[in-house]
């Protein structure tokens, strides 16, 4: 692995993960902009972005009791972003603190690539996780 890949490769792997993990749910996938140009992405950004995405999908599968999942991929000249939203049971962030590694892992991954993480959840309404990482971050 040379440490270089493209966002096109990354998004293809992510689409495969959607099918494997939450493909049995009513799933919609959107790209912003709709026809994205492929851009190079550094190894660390790619790794942490992909594993955070899989964690978000696994959380929907394990905890959300959701019927619908919406995934958005967003690409700008400097950042790659995913947003995973579900219509599941949601949670109170205060009640989740210390009860597992999922939220800590999201924060750690965002910090490692100088990225941003936003988690919104409403009990009985669902959860949205938004994770953004710079395309060129390298943790040497």
How would you name each of these model-derived features?
Residues 1-140:
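Coiled-coil dimerization/phosphotransfer module
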